[in-house]
Structures are given as structure tokens and as C-alpha cells.
């Protein structure tokens, strides 16, 4: 049973993973619009009939402040500051807002709620996935297996591919648009794409 979890609640905070500055929050309307796009893209790969879609707002919106505090008490500040992006921002004199530190905890709690056996994510999500393992152990569950994938660099060859960075190739774009964008990629970047997307090195 595959579970596609839509983070409609923490999206209003903004995922701080890999960010050097605080990410602007999204409105509820933007979150729902994005969720529709995510599911459309996901079902290009996943079997719709064998996939359950869940929204974590279903449990987070029911939490009392007392329950939130109890959940926070399970994670230390030292653990949070060991996270590379938070650590880099603190050392660089940049702000890390308290609400951003909620994101890994919420993602970790998702694993408890859906009783995840395996969680898939990019390498930038490893910290959050490990928080989930710890919380599952505390709840008497078998901790999930973490499967992380390399991040795909964007067309700028610098940052990860992201719509918010404008350096992406959309999976639902017209073929002509995809082709044009890929043709703009450097040879060095194409070598990386071959390795990450096809699992093989490009023949020269």
C-alpha cells in the first residue's frame, strides 16, 4: 500500500530544507492548488488504485497546544542545530525562526500517524526522516526504513531543481518546452542527469 502524503498543514510554514533564508509561508488556497498539481504529477508514476492520499492537516489541526508542547519535548535544540542548513544559518549570522524548527517534528510525526514502513525522500530530507524513526520508536513502532535519492540539480547547475527557483523542467510541460529546456543544459549537467535519472554514465 503506497501512501501519498500531502503536507497541507506544514506547507503554511514552508519547508526550510536546504534554505539559507526563511521560506515565505503559503496561503491555504495556494497549498490546495499545489496539492492538486502534486497528485496529478504523482499519478504519472504511481498506480492511482493502489495509492492512498492523506493530508496531514487532518491530525495537526486537531492537536491542542498541550499536545504540541509534548511533541516538541521529544526533540532537543541540540538535535535541531545539528541539522546542516540550520547550523549554516546560525553560523552565518542568519535567522532561524522557531516555527521552522517545527517542520522536521511535524514530518516525523506524519510517519507515526500513517505507521510508515518506508519513507522516500531527497537527501535533504534525511534529518526529517530520522526524526520520524525516533518518534516511531518512542511510540513502540518498528522504525521506518529511510530511502533517500540524490537531489537533481536545476538547469542553472547550482541549486536543486525547483519551481520556486525557476530552474526546473516540469513533468507536465509540453514536450517542446521540455526539449528546449534540456537543450539549454550544459554538457557537465547532462552527465549528472544521465547518472541520476538513468542510473548510468553517458557514452562520450
Task: For each feature predicted by the language model, list its residue ranges.
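Short clusters of hydrophobic/aromatic residues that line enzyme substrate/ligand-binding pockets
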Residues: 13, 26, 86, 90, ...
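Anionic group-transfer/hydrolysis microenvironments
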Residues: 9, 109-112, 150-152, 165
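Short acidic-hydrophobic sequence patches enriched in Asp/Glu that either
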Residues: 5, 27-34, 170-174
Amino acid at each position: 500500500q503506497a501512501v501519498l502524503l500531502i503536507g497541507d498543514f506544514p506547507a503554511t510554514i514552508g519547508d526550510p530544507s536546504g534554505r539559507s533564508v526563511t521560506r515565505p509561508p503559503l496561503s491555504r488556497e495556494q497549498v490546495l492548488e499545489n496539492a492538486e498539481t502534486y497528485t496529478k504529477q504523482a499519478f504519472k508514476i504511481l498506480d492511482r488504485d493502489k495509492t492512498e492520499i492523506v493530508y496531514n492537516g487532518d491530525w495537526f489541526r486537531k492537536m491542542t497546544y498541550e499536545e504540541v508542547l509534548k511533541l516538541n519535548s521529544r526533540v532537543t535544540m541540540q538535535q535541531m542545530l545539528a541539522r546542516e542548513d540550520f547550523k549554516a544559518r546560525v553560523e552565518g549570522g542568519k535567522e532561524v525562526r522557531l516555527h521552522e524548527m517545527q517542520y522536521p517534528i511535524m514530518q516525523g510525526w506524519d510517519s507515526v500517524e500513517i505507521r510508515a514502513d518506508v519513507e522516500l525522500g531527497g537527501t535533504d530530507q534525511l534529518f526529517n526522516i530520522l526524526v520520524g524513526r525516533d518518534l516511531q520508536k518512542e511510540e513502540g513502532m518498528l522504525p521506518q526504513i529511510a530511502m533517500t535519492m540524490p537531489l537533481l540539480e536545476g538547469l542553472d547547475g547550482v541549486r536543486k531543481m525547483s519551481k520556486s527557483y525557476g530552474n526546473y523542467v516540469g513533468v507536465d510541460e509540453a514536450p517542446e518546452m521540455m526539449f528546449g529546456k534540456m537543450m539549454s543544459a550544459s554538457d557537465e549537467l547532462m552527465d549528472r542527469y544521465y547518472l541520476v535519472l538513468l542510473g548510468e554514465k553517458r557514452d562520450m
